[in-house]
């Protein structure tokens, strides 16, 4: 027979094992965060480099800063996109916080949301998502919650009127027979050549399977962040560069009224489709409104957006012509 003290000890041991197992399971089910994990640090040629594990890995100076999950949590994502799963939305159950954070992890070592102090990171996330929200919204003037609450309502263009196949690129990015290259994703991708370039960057065959962007939310966010981080042409800056101050305007840029800030991100992404058309451009103002609204909801406040002339590209000469940019209309068309 087992003595009472020994039996009690066995029960305590079993209870402890069960408790620890339950704790591990709960930890795995919780949202990922790097805030409680100390980074690995090494010095290379006098420069401090860090690795924070899954969210910011690969020894980067940017990984020494706050990661996105440190300042942008699930509840904030839900606040920004509060109507995305409403019954009248067109991508119910598709978009979620985890997909965004997983996608962002690929680009945080490159500075996405991690270039500079925490405030700078919060502003960049709001700026990027401001573009996303405006391009995937089904909001309108009298919509419940207001027109700015309906971002991520779409994940694809609902009624495309063409296949968006440009035969000029038939040698480099040939169209797959019967496939439509209409808008899909968080920053909707259009045209065979854009699907081809994006697929090459993400190592996914989007040219043959553009539908992947409407089937996988993480991939859809990755494609959008890649576009945000990548110059549209070799001699141009990226939207990320012009927003975080990495881009330094030349004399020609200054003469063309192109200055760093949110307005320049619109210029990089959409060029002459939107910019240099005055302050009454509805599409431009819609993008700016989403950014300001998201700054408020994320906890930064629109007063941190800077002077009005830097918020828009109303009088900026375009970085690029429309031939290098996708259609500026969102995927709700």
Curated annotation (Swiss-Prot):
Renumbered to this chain, region (Disordered) spans 307-333
Q: Which is a Gene Ontology cellular component entry for this protein?
A: extracellular region
Matching InterPro entries, A to Z? Glyco_hydro_19 (IPR016283), Glyco_hydro_19_cat (IPR000726), Lysozyme-like_dom_sf (IPR023346)
Keywords noted in UniProt? Disulfide bond, Glycoprotein, Secreted, Signal
- Give compartment(s): Secreted
In which tissues is this gene expressed? Mostly expressed in stems, especially in xylem and interfascicular fibers.
Q: Which residues are glycosylated?
A: 65, 216, 252
- The signal sequence is 1-27
- Superkingdom of the source? Eukaryota
Its function, per the record, reads: No chitinase activity. Required for proper cell wall biosynthesis in etiolated seedlings. Prevents lignin accumulation in hypocotyls.
Q: Which family does it belong to?
A: Belongs to the glycosyl hydrolase 19 family.
UniProt name for this protein: Chitinase-like protein 2
């Amino acid at each position: 027979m087992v003595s009472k003290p020994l039996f009690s000890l066995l029960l305590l041991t079993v209870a402890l094992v069960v408790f620890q197992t339950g704790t591990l399971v709960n930890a795995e089910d919780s949202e990922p965060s790097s805030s409680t994990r100390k980074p690995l640090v090494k010095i290379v040629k006098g420069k401090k480099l860090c690795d924070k594990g899954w969210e910011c890995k690969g020894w980067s100076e940017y990984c020494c800063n706050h990661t996105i999950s440190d300042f942008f949590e699930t509840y904030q994502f839900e606040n920004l996109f509060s109507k995305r799963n409403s019954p009248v939305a067109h991508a119910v159950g598709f978009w979620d916080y985890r997909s965004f954070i997983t996608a962002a992890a690929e680009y945080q070592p490159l500075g996405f949301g991690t270039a500079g102090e925490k405030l700078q990171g919060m502003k960049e996330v709001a700026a990027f998502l401001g573009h996303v929200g405006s391009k995937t919204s089904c909001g309108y003037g009298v919509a419940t919650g207001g027109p700015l609450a309906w971002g991520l309502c779409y994940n694809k263009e609902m009624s495309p009127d063409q296949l968006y196949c440009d035969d000029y690129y038939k040698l480099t990015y040939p169209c797959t027979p019967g496939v439509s290259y209409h808008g899909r994703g968080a920053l909707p991708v259009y045209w065979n050549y854009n699907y081809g370039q994006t697929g090459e960057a993400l190592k996914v065959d989007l040219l043959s399977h553009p539908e992947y962007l409407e089937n996988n939310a993480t991939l859809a966010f990755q494609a959008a962040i890649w576009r945000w981080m990548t110059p549209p042409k070799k001699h141009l800056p990226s939207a990320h560069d012009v927003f975080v101050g990495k881009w330094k305007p030349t004399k020609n840029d200054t003469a063309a009224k192109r200055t760093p800030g949110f307005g320049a991100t619109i210029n990089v992404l959409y060029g002459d489709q939107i910019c240099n058309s005055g302050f009454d451009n509805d599409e431009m103002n819609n993008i700016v409104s989403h950014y300001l609204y998201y700054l408020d909801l994320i906890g930064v406040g629109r007063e941190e957006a800077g002077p009005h002339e830097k918020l828009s590209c109303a009088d900026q000469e375009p970085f690029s012509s429309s031939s290098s940019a996708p259609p500026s209309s969102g995927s709700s068309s």
